[in-house]
């Protein structure tokens, strides 16, 4: 594993932040040089909350790249999708700033995990969706799903979108965070999605994130 990977989810509140932090922690334990980035953080004033969570999970302090805002190049105060948060804050989202920050991180670290906002179809600007940006940058995707009701539908829709855009799926992360809602649905969702991943993206990895890993 080397390069820049985009971490997305099938929906909001699916556990992308914890999944990103846990994956970064595992890579650190393997001796890899890894950093996480939250290119657009909404609902914050100064420090990207998701980056703080990543560092806590990774067991490391805020890094020099964090202090230089390379890991959090765009922060908006209103908790909404990036395009709406930018509009309400009265300024445009700077895609060049984000690209430059990611490139600088990639030059310093072996692996960069870029955590997106929401799912693949979340608008970054009025004209650009998150999936458009991923396609432009040719980033492989790490997709986070779970076993809650509706996850199969949302996961398969995400699969279809990735295929339509010609984007490589690196891995599907099954987050057990919602298992307690309905154990039957969670277990069936796991087995079904595991089979579908093998059929639809045969080279992609299957990963699982235990609920006890959450912070």
Swiss-Prot record:
<dbReference type="GO" id="GO:0005829">
    <property type="term" value="C:cytosol"/>
</dbReference>
<comment type="subunit">
    <text>Homodimer.</text>
</comment>
<keyword id="KW-0963">Cytoplasm</keyword>
<feature type="binding site">
    <location>
        <position position="50"/>
    </location>
    <ligand>
        <name>ATP</name>
    </ligand>
</feature>
<feature type="binding site">
    <location>
        <begin position="13"/>
        <end position="18"/>
    </location>
    <ligand>
        <name>ATP</name>
    </ligand>
</feature>
<feature type="binding site">
    <location>
        <position position="50"/>
    </location>
    <ligand>
        <name>Mg(2+)</name>
    </ligand>
</feature>
<dbReference type="GO" id="GO:0000287">
    <property type="term" value="F:magnesium ion binding"/>
</dbReference>
<feature type="binding site">
    <location>
        <begin position="175"/>
        <end position="176"/>
    </location>
    <ligand>
        <name>ATP</name>
    </ligand>
</feature>
<keyword id="KW-0067">ATP-binding</keyword>
<comment type="pathway">
    <text>Cofactor biosynthesis; biotin biosynthesis; biotin from 7,8-diaminononanoate: step 1/2.</text>
</comment>
<dbReference type="GO" id="GO:0004141">
    <property type="term" value="F:dethiobiotin synthase activity"/>
</dbReference>
<comment type="similarity">
    <text>Belongs to the dethiobiotin synthetase family.</text>
</comment>
<keyword id="KW-0093">Biotin biosynthesis</keyword>
<dbReference type="Pfam" id="PF13500">
    <property type="entry name" value="AAA_26"/>
</dbReference>
<keyword id="KW-0547">Nucleotide-binding</keyword>
<feature type="binding site">
    <location>
        <position position="42"/>
    </location>
    <ligand>
        <name>substrate</name>
    </ligand>
</feature>
<feature type="binding site">
    <location>
        <begin position="115"/>
        <end position="118"/>
    </location>
    <ligand>
        <name>ATP</name>
    </ligand>
</feature>
<dbReference type="InterPro" id="IPR004472">
    <property type="entry name" value="DTB_synth_BioD"/>
</dbReference>
<dbReference type="GO" id="GO:0005524">
    <property type="term" value="F:ATP binding"/>
</dbReference>
<dbReference type="InterPro" id="IPR027417">
    <property type="entry name" value="P-loop_NTPase"/>
</dbReference>
<keyword id="KW-0436">Ligase</keyword>
<dbReference type="GO" id="GO:0009102">
    <property type="term" value="P:biotin biosynthetic process"/>
</dbReference>
<feature type="binding site">
    <location>
        <position position="115"/>
    </location>
    <ligand>
        <name>Mg(2+)</name>
    </ligand>
</feature>
<comment type="function">
    <text>Catalyzes a mechanistically unusual reaction, the ATP-dependent insertion of CO2 between the N7 and N8 nitrogen atoms of 7,8-diaminopelargonic acid (DAPA, also called 7,8-diammoniononanoate) to form a ureido ring.</text>
</comment>
<feature type="active site">
    <location>
        <position position="38"/>
    </location>
</feature>
<keyword id="KW-0479">Metal-binding</keyword>
<feature type="binding site">
    <location>
        <position position="17"/>
    </location>
    <ligand>
        <name>Mg(2+)</name>
    </ligand>
</feature>
<protein>
    <recommendedName>
        <fullName>ATP-dependent dethiobiotin synthetase BioD</fullName>
        <ecNumber>6.3.3.3</ecNumber>
    </recommendedName>
</protein>
<keyword id="KW-0460">Magnesium</keyword>
